[in-house]
Amino acid sequence: MKKIFLAFLLITAMMTFAQQDNFEISKSLSIYNNVFRELNMNYVDEIDASELNTVAIDAMLDQLDPYTVFIKESEIEDYRMMTTGEYGGIGAIIRLEGDYVHISEPYEGFPAHKAGLIAGDKILSINGIDTKGKNTQEVSELLKGQAGTTLEIVVSRYGEKNPITKTLTREKVKIDNIPYYGVFDNNIGYIALGQFTKNAATELKTAFIEMKQQTDLKGLVIDLRGNGGGLLKEAVDIVNIFVPKDKLVVYTKGKNVQQNSQHRTEFEPVDTEIPLVILVNGGSASASEIVAGSIQDFDRGVILGQRTFGKGLVQNILQMSYNTQIKVTVAKYYIPSNRCIQEIDYSKNKKKTTDSIAADTLGQRFTTANGRVVYEGHGIKPDVEVKIDQMSILTIMLYNKDMFAKFADKFFYEHKKIASADKFAIDDKLYQEFIDFVKEQGFTYTNESERILSELKKTVKREGNETMLSDEIDLMEKELANAKADDFNKSRKDIVEMLRMEIVSRYYFQKGKIVTSFTDDEELHEAFNVILDTERYNEILGRNK
């Protein structure tokens, strides 16, 4: 009798909470409807009801997390492209420079490339529409369209006096999941995985098998740096290439039990023994973290680089009225050690900022298959951490002001061909040419020391100490000017790397940029060291116990 009574109390309590929730929802909707109606009837100026409604919805969703968003009808195609990696267009990356959008990088083999458009081309008009003052999103919408349709584009080009007119036929553009793969001289394979759209796992599997057939691979490096994620199924299937069938890779848990699911490996693996290193950094998120975290939890490979982003949330896209959608966070995902890698608890952290306290002191401890300790939350901590020096202010400002791109445009006009991507180098003469070019462009920048000194001068003046400290401040300004004159020497390594990639991309496109980046890639070289040192590799994975 007591059990029946307790059950009755529990059911009654649940019904009461449900009724309260329903009342609050009805109340809120009624208030919103009344406010909207009164604004429409009484506000002094005409209001755009659709725009006002979108702003209200966005403000509401902003209280939750960055991934729960309202998708307007005009944005649906962009979200479809994020899933499939396909869109109808000309196949080019664009960038804003001044008042005009420029071609930043045409995709090799697609309409922009086939029509002869090159990096640096300034887009003047599209189908007769002047593009001056338009942003990249607006220009992108003009360039995109159904495959098979044509467009006329007018561009100006460095070194050409007159505008150039091109007629292009749009195609279905497929952004490569794998922009590059290949085998190095040390017989270590490398696969750069840029995203997890449809068929990513199949493409990676095909590339891996092809390399295995070409040579006796000593190991494999999968590069997930900067990969923000994508389809969960593709992540699971990629793990499946390296671990046995029927292994639990990830499971999800949400408020509604319908969102709870388990995702296991379904096929026989390709190779469960080859030494494996996964490269990650702060831009590796979501599906990338499922792959890296699962490989780490299974002790199947070594994770190398910097701590990952920490996105352990699952979203579903739900259909709404009037051809709109809402992408909703419905669950958290957990990897084989049972840890969740989510960095921020958005229910408690409305500012959506990370905590500065050391991550390992906060997260719950879990263990891998071999008993290694790993921690929950805060992304995936690499087994081998490689610290990357922060890029200098000078290099950042040169990039932000398009100095690398502008010089590359000039260089491409003056040089019809260069050495192969892996052999092209920036020598002293070319580096000085770049410095001279930058000065001719009137480039200026303020470094951190100058900014602090400027603030100090304001404070000294405000406090009436200007006369007393003027000599000291003048001396500091002279010393800083002398030090700044040497900035191009101090930042040479970063500048050379950026400049080389920009120039190489004009001749060898995206693959060339990747190949030329290998020269200075400390993480890749450390990955080679780990793979080639069998004892170290096994020790990292806890296999020597």
How would you label these PLM feature ranges?
Residues 43-104, 148-170, 175-180, 518-528, ...:
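Extended, small/polar residue-biased N-terminal targeting/export presequences
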Residues 340-341, 345-347, 351-545:
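Conserved functional hotspot residues or short segments at active or partner-binding sites
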Residues 1-23:
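Bacterial Sec-dependent N-terminal signal peptides
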Residues 105, 134, 167, 329, ...:
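Short linear motifs in exposed loops
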Residues 18-28, 32-49, 72, 102-106, ...:
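Cleft-lining beta-strand/loop regions that shape enzyme active-site pockets
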Residues 287, 299, 306, 310-372, ...:
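Polar, glycine-rich mid-to-C-terminal structural blocks
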Residues 120-122:
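Structural motif
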Residues 126-127, 377:
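Residue-level recognition of conserved beta-strand edge/terminus positions
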